[in-house]
Amino acid sequence: YADETVGGSAVPMGDHWTYTFEAAIPEDAEGSFTVSMEGRIEVEVDYGNETDTERDYAENPMMAFAVTDTEAVERRMVVDDAKCESCHVNLRLHGSNRHDVTYCSTCHAANTVDIADVPESVHMKWMIHKIHRGAELENGYIVVRSRGTYDFSNIHYTGDLRNCDACHVNNSQQLPLADNLLP
């Protein structure tokens, strides 16, 4: 996982932009990787007696590319955003510019923890289930970040937690899971 701020480093190429990552692909990398992006445009709006900064948030594009696979393998569809939106209505996180559940898995990958001092898994499949069960968990679910502590212990899922199809698609919750999935 590499996180880079593009800022003024992108180069216009006609109606597109190019950017060369500083982080190299690890020499032992295998399979397929995904490149994704988040962004927003900030515009100052003059309302006559005051000005304010408005933000227009971009979609979260993702592109899989093959490292050693013959063809790029896309991330599997586990949950559909439309199902999230049926409860959350315009779900946006981390400054409102992350709003696609598949995109979330780009950073919230296996073996990802919040901070080293008080490690709590933020792997998407672990984290999302714990958040939705918050109030039912014996010890709750608290995530400590550099920007603050987030306590999900009071979250009550309004549906039936046994109804996996309320969120999952394509029988993605069915066991046994495929052997080639990340832990």
Indicate where each model-derived feature is located.
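Extended surface/linker regions that mediate inter-domain or inter-protein docking
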Residues: 1-183
